[in-house]
Amino acid sequence: MFVDTHCHLTMLDLTPYAGDLDVALQQARDAGVSKFMSISVNLDDHIALAEIAARHSDVGYSVGVHPCEDPATMARATTDYLIELAQPEKVWAIGETGLDYFHSTDFIAEQKQCFARHIHASQAVKKPVVVHTRAAKHDTVDIIRAEKSTHGILHCFTEDWETAKAVLDCGYYVSFSGIVSFKNAQDLRDVAK
């Protein structure tokens, strides 16, 4: 049995599945996936994700704003608004949130503030936070520690052992993507061990 803890069902290219999400989900079920958590990247995703989750008992979703979204969208993600969006039973997590300095360093302050608000919402509704971090490992760990966040996952982890240990010590999980299989990813494979 497998659980896909990080899929983007609203972004999936359905061409190989005759344009039908149900076909894609059934193929995954046939391969042993028993639950799917579709991850939100902006404040409008929850509408489509709620509709998908209502049709599929094995699909839940998250609510949140990806750190590469524009500052105006990040500003709309207040703690209270995230708490409001997180009320449905099928909302299993808060996020995708975090810090991404790889794509842009123009809005670091906004990313940090938005990340902290997601953590506050996560704590208020007692649901885990889904964290994206890229080229921002120190600030990510610092915010998790400062906010005393103890329930979450760093997805698509590509950082070093020290970062993994720091978030594991906070009660977080880390997940690895297919990147771990790349020939030049021996350091990442060592972290996964």
Q: Model-derived features: where do they sit?
A:
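Mid-domain alpha/beta scaffold segments of enzyme catalytic cores
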Residues: 1-193
